[in-house]
Amino acid sequence: MATELQTEQRELAKFIRAGASRGPQCFGSYFDEKGGSCALGAVYDAVYHLPREHGKLIPDHLERLFRCLDEVTKRCPHEGCHKRLPLAPMLVHLNDDHVWTREQIADWLTAESQ
């Protein structure tokens, strides 16, 4: 039986995939001026249905998402990396440091929550 946190992780993966379909991937920030998003930005985009022309309205933090972002700690799945981080920084780490696609991150989250 899936725990509540595992269910939230699967939901998070679903939002990453949905947000990833809305624009290109970016690195180093949640959003960029070209309409791109990182993995966490993709979640925010999918949950809040951000307008395509966001201009200066780029959110600088995520609120009211899922408790699993803070409460779940994971080991980095990238070969040779030994970091252990809470889920939110882990998503940023995989996106920015290992340049994983948002879809790869969502797939990993889904597999981890089974």
Pin down the residues of each PLM region:
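Domain-length accessory/inserted modules outside core catalytic folds
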Residues: 1-37, 43-114
